[in-house]
Amino acid sequence: MPTIQQLVKSARQKLVNKTKAPALKSCPQRRGICLRVYTVTPKKPNSALRKVARVRLSSGFEVTAYIPGIGHNLQEHAVVLVRGGRVKDLPGVRYHIVRGTLDTAGVKGRVQGRSKYGVKKVSAKSAGKSK
């Protein structure tokens, strides 16, 4: 424990919070270009083929971003919007691609949690016509 004299000479240092998404440079989202779209396997004990993309952001960073939802239309050179948010069972994946913006289509047939997957509301009229 420091003495009062030591505290007078130099005050206590404030702890600096480290950002969890440094590539976004304090912005909520960033635009980027897909360099490679591929699948990776998660850590134990999970098993799957998770869809991810290597993205070069407008901030100059190159990051790995997760593609949420079932099915996607992303290819190399697609322009995407990237937000923060890690995927717990994929080491090194600290970003998510936003569905339903720029070149990324929304998830087809999604009815619940639509806002997270870029899907417009299906009205009762149009739902009746499709059957």
UniProtKB/Swiss-Prot annotation:
Gene Ontology BP, a term: translation
InterPro entries in the record: NA-bd_OB-fold, Ribosomal_uS12, Ribosomal_uS12_bac
Gene Ontology MF terms in the entry: rRNA binding; structural constituent of ribosome
Compartments it resides in: Plastid, Chloroplast
GO cellular component: chloroplast; small ribosomal subunit
Pfam families the UniProt entry points to: Ribosom_S12_S23
Keywords: Chloroplast, Plastid, Ribonucleoprotein, Ribosomal protein, RNA-binding, rRNA-binding
First-listed, main subcellular location of the protein, grouped into a coarse class: plastid
Keyword Aminoacyl-tRNA synthetase appears in the UniProt entry: no
Known role: With S4 and S5 plays an important role in translational accuracy. Located at the interface of the 30S and 50S subunits.
Record-stated family: Belongs to the universal ribosomal protein uS12 family.
Subunit comment: Part of the 30S ribosomal subunit.
Name the UniProt record assigns to this protein: Small ribosomal subunit protein uS12c
UniProt organism field: Stigeoclonium helveticum
